[in-house]
């Protein structure tokens, strides 16, 4: 019995790692450019097309001056916004050095035949840390937003607490694994679909690791919604689920 239990645990662990792989695997191969190198190109008035791969809400809230806003999830629908000249330099970036959206978009551009494509190393935080300027078309006021740990959220669900689970991850990430009962409105669609959300229930926002949900919560709070965030995002939920399923091995008789 112990062997069977051990094998089950091994298979469960392998399945968990496979679930994580598409979202948190290694960054796809794409050339990187440092904030200093990019700043030098911009100072030299080089012909560079900057592309912000975040949602429209994030793009309006903070971006490198002169950037196009082309969310990774809408790449195929917005190919016409890319330059006709396949030799132009394209620089993609997103909200953190852990974000894969910029790498995915960069590789898609290369597949279309663009020859000079790179990704900003460190993303937008790296740009800011280097001391360079960002712009905001519509800065979202920040406020204190509570968060709920996975164990507490699990208890809420078991007790039937009247909450609304809003998963703002991409459609692909949602299909690969979601919390039962959650509704998927990806962040890039939130500015167009927030009115579909209920005003009479607390909304629990779920993202990848608990970072993007803060800005999304501030945005919804400004619209009159009562929000909280899943601490650590879906990553923490999966970790908690894995730990709760782990059973101690029985004693040898």
Predicted regions and their residues:
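Rhodanese-like catalytic fold shared by cysteine-dependent sulfurtransferases
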Residues: 2-6, 19-36, 44, 48-49, ...
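Anionic group-transfer/hydrolysis microenvironments
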Residues: 54, 169
